[in-house]
Amino acid sequence: HDAYCGDEVAYGQIIGMPARFKAPTELIEKALSLNNLPDCKDLHVKAGLTVSGEWFVNSREKMQQIMDHFPEATAVDMESCSIAQVCHIYQTPFVSFRVISDVPLKDNKASQYYDFWERIANGSFEVTKHFINLIHNPSLIHNS
């Protein structure tokens, strides 16, 4: 979200790379099917655009800049795009799971952050475990 490589490419696009990296539909469907599993139903797995950059969103101005360029963004992080670029170069399917720790610019972000650490370990493990199982056993989608 914070890269500018001139007017020849889209805002945020690195020259020689796609403007956006799209996960394979099959992986997105498997990820969303996790919502139907009892161990994951409270985790609210969603699909959407994650924008990635080199600075932490800690002001209204930074958040507004992101929303001006990417109004459909559902998450902001500092890692996903670099991982997606490497996967693109090596032609490796990629999907990113983000556990949202806080909503930028909310008054209760400190409490959101501390509550996040209570939830992250079990939630991340369950999502990862079940997603890997779905990749190796596609029939599990229909049994949930």
For each feature predicted by the language model, list its residue ranges:
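A C-terminal functional module that forms or caps the active site or interfaces directly
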Residues: 55-109
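Noncatalytic linker/hinge segments flanking ATPase motor cores
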Residues: 2-21, 90-96, 117, 135-144
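Conserved active-site and cofactor/substrate-binding residues in soluble primary-metabolism enzymes
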Residues: 22, 26, 61, 78-81, ...
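Mid-sequence, gly/pro-rich, charge-dense loop/helix-turn segments that line enzyme active sites
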Residues: 1-70
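A structural motif corresponding to the C-terminal end of an alpha-helix
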Residues: 34-44, 83-92, 130-134
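Short, surface-exposed, polar/charged, turn-prone segments marking secondary-structure boundaries
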Residues: 1-4, 75-79, 103-106, 122-127
